[in-house]
Each structure stands twice: as C-alpha cells, then as structure tokens.
C-alpha cells in the first residue's frame, strides 16, 4: 500500500485526521527532507527516507518500489498532494510501468486556502492557481495564463512566486496584470503559513514590494470587486446586503 499524503502547509493543527492516521499506520515514510521534519511528531521510530530538492522522480519511484515489496508506505507532500504535489507523478509512474500497486490519495490543505484564511476572505468568488516556476512549464506558457486570468478578472493565487533563480518572475507577472487590473487592486502575501515564522501583509498591485517574497510565500491578487476593510482582504460573493 502506498499512501500519498498531503500534510498541509506546515502546522499540525492544519493536518487532517486521515493524514495523521495514515502516517501513524505507515511502516516507512518517504519525503522531501524539510517536510519530514514537519511531521516528526507522527513518525516516531519509523524508517524515514529523506531526499533533497529536484529529486521528485527518485523519491516517488522509491516509495512505489517499497510498496511493491509489501510495505505500508507513506509518501508525504506539502499542502495537497494533488496540487503541484506528488500525487500526479506517482500515478504517472505506476501507469507508465503498468504496476500493480495500491495507491491511496489523502487530501491536505493547500497553501492558498491556508493563506486566504489568514488574510480574510479573498477567495469568495472565482479564482485560479498559477505557479510561477518554469522548471517544468515553459515561461511563455505561464505568461499566457497570467494574461488570460487577468483579462477574465479571476482572483489569482501565485504559487512558487520568487526564488534566487527566478527573482524577476513575480514582477513580470504584475507587469502583465497591470494591463487588466487597477494599480489599487488589493494583494495579500503570506509567508510560511502555519509555521513558526509565519508572516502576512496587505498591499496593492501598484505598491507591491517583491523583495520579501520567497518560495515559502503565497501571493493572492484580488479581482475588480476585492477590497480591504479593517485589515481584512474581502472578495464579495455577490449577496445583496
């Protein structure tokens, strides 16, 4: 059995009971080393296999092979495993290799949901997720999606917004959005949601400071109706009040 588990954004309080129970039931836990530290309370003396960044295929293949050997394996992924996580890669590998492995997918709280709850209620109407990482998706494709989302007036949740190797991507995204969104459009940023160094702040499309944003950040750009009241970012659902 291979359980692909979304462990949420980092706080044990934001993990589902199903995820906790699956971790406790597993014989072996496989994951990115940073994420294995986040679930230490549930792994005890279990065997924990840690890998570094950019070794996702190796990590998933190891988990699959251990499950094939008869072990109860937990492969952990931050947030929800089916949103920029390991779930799809596991299913692709199992399908491509025509393997007979029981795979169970356990949902978790994705970063946008955790961030939204800290900022107010910015996702009350239609929204989309866009990752600014171009490691697996060509940047021109990402740019087209940003433009389309802006023109459609979606609230936009930017994942993987800025790293040492991609310092200009978020600024470029904001430049593209300036063609369809007002400079006064509210923007919310949350860093390390649910973790010890959690931070949050509100700004606007025109006043955004990109420097503090990193890979632990989630950036939410509002739509034409989004506003800030009493320090809370709100996107109206459309009720007549």
From Swiss-Prot:
InterPro entries assigned: 4pyrrol_Mease, 4pyrrol_Methylase_sf, 4pyrrole_Mease_sub1, 4pyrrole_Mease_sub2, Cbl_synth_CobJ/CibH_dom, Precorrin_MeTrfase
GO biological process terms, alphabetically, are: cobalamin biosynthetic process; methylation
Pathway of this protein? Answer: Cofactor biosynthesis; adenosylcobalamin biosynthesis; cob(II)yrinate a,c-diamide from sirohydrochlorin (anaerobic route): step 3/10
For this protein, the Enzyme Commission number is 2.1.1.-
Enzyme class, one word?
A: transferase
- Give a GO molecular function annotation for the protein: methyltransferase activity
Name the keywords, alphabetized: Cobalamin biosynthesis, Methyltransferase, S-adenosyl-L-methionine, Transferase
From the UniProt record, list the reaction(s) this protein catalyses. Co(II)-factor III + S-adenosyl-L-methionine + H(+) = Co(II)-factor IV + S-adenosyl-L-homocysteine
- The UniProt record lists the keyword DNA repair: no
As for what it does, the entry says: May also convert cobalt-precorrin-3 to cobalt-precorrin-4.
Family membership: Belongs to the precorrin methyltransferase family.
- What protein name does the entry list? Probable cobalt-factor III C(17)-methyltransferase
What species is given as this protein's source? Salmonella typhimurium (strain LT2 / SGSC1412 / ATCC 700720)
């Amino acid at each position: 059995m291979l359980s692909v588990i979304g462990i949420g954004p980092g706080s044990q309080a934001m993990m589902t009971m199903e995820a906790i129970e699956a971790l406790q039931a597993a014989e072996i836990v496989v994951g990115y080393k940073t994420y294995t530290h986040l679930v230490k309370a549930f792994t005890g003396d279990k065997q924990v296999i840690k890998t570094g960044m950019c070794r996702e295929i190796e990590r998933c293949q190891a988990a699959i092979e251990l499950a094939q050997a008869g072990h109860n394996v937990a492969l952990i992924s931050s947030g929800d495993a089916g949103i920029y996580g390991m779930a799809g890669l596991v299913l692709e590998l199992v399908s491509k290799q025509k393997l007979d492995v029981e795979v169970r997918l356990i949902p978790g709280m994705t970063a946008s949901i955790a961030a939204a709850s800290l900022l107010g209620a910015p996702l009350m109407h239609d929204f989309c997720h866009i990752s600014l990482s171009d490691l697996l998706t060509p940047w021109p494709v990402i740019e087209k999606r940003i433009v389309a989302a802006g023109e459609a007036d979606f609230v936009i949740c930017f994942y993987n917004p800025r790293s040492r190797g991609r310092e200009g991507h978020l600024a470029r995204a904001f430049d593209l959005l300036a063609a369809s969104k007002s400079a006064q459009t509210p923007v919310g940023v949350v860093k390390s949601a649910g973790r010890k160094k959690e931070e949050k702040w509100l700004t606007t499309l025109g006043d955004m400071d990109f420097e503090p944003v990193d890979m632990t950040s989630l950036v939410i750009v509002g739509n034409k109706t989004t506003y800030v009241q009493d320090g809370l970012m709100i996107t109206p659902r459309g009720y007549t009040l």
